[in-house]
Structures are given as C-alpha cells and as structure tokens.
Amino acid sequence: MATTMAKLITLVVLAILAFVEVSVSGYKTSISTITIEDNGRCTKSIPPICFPDGRP
C-alpha cells in the first residue's frame, strides 16, 4: 500500500513540475517578446506592465 502511494505521489509531483516548467518557459518567452517590442520599457511586475509610448 505504501509503495503504491509513494509511486502515485511521485507521478503527481512530476506532472506538476512538468506543467510548471512549461508555464515558466512560456512566460519567459512572452516577457522577452514584450521587452524586445517595447525596447525594454517594461516593469518587472507580474504581469509586466509596458509603456510603448516611452514613459518610464
């Protein structure tokens, strides 16, 4: 019983980690795209706030 439970927990943890990794890489991609488009005029908050008209 304990080994089955441990295997189940391991699978759940791996699934969560895989999902988080995908989310993070997607988020990093969107941040770098935004930053390039706006020449880096973005706040470092989540979600990033950007000012395309050049305000700080």
UniProtKB/Swiss-Prot annotation:
There is a cross-link at G40-D53 (Cyclopeptide (Gly-Asp)). This is a cyclic peptide. Keywords: Disulfide bond, Protease inhibitor, Serine protease inhibitor, Signal. GO terms for biological process: negative regulation of endopeptidase activity. The gene is sfti1. GO terms for molecular function: endopeptidase inhibitor activity; protease binding; serine-type endopeptidase inhibitor activity. Residues 26-39, 54-56 form a propeptide. It comes from the Eukaryota. The record marks K44, S45 as: Reactive bond. This is Trypsin inhibitor 1. Residues 1-25 form the signal peptide. Disulfide bonds join C42-C50.
